[in-house]
Amino acid sequence: MQTGAVTSILFDFESGELLEKWLYFTSDTHFDSVYCNRNMFFSDLDQAKLRDAFVFVIGDFFDAMQGRFDPRRDMSILRPEYRRSDYYDYVVKDSSEKLEKYANNIAMIAPGNHELSVLKNANTFLSDRLVSYLNNKTGSRIIHGGYGGW
């Protein structure tokens, strides 16, 4: 349920039994940056999958600072495979393919200021596209979360 920037996720456990559930929270992955530690990221996701954990991606999954209209643009920090004219399209496609096997564990992907900057300057919502792709491809029910600051 989305109310403004607040995302509520309700879990209905009908059995009435005590249930232990692992939760995995990650933020600021900056997946398309050369500084993203992908080995650690995927190792953590493998552990989450093994434990049947709910995964919450809390903002800035994408670095997304190398677009044409971003004043912070520095191509040297963009992973080489994304240095192409369809950068935003390709990074969504590539990352979604790499996340497919974890889709049923991912409960929510929320945008951060990096995704919102791309939405403002390039009129595309990277995190929403990622969620849509994963849900359509895998049948998962990932929620696209909100963004807010207090």
Protein language model regions, located:
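Short, intrinsically disordered, charge-balanced linker/junction segments flanking boundaries
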Residues: G145-W150
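Core catalytic region of metal-dependent phosphoesterases/phosphodiesterases
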Residues: I9-K21, T26, F31-H144
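N-terminal soluble segments of membrane proteins
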Residues: M1-A5
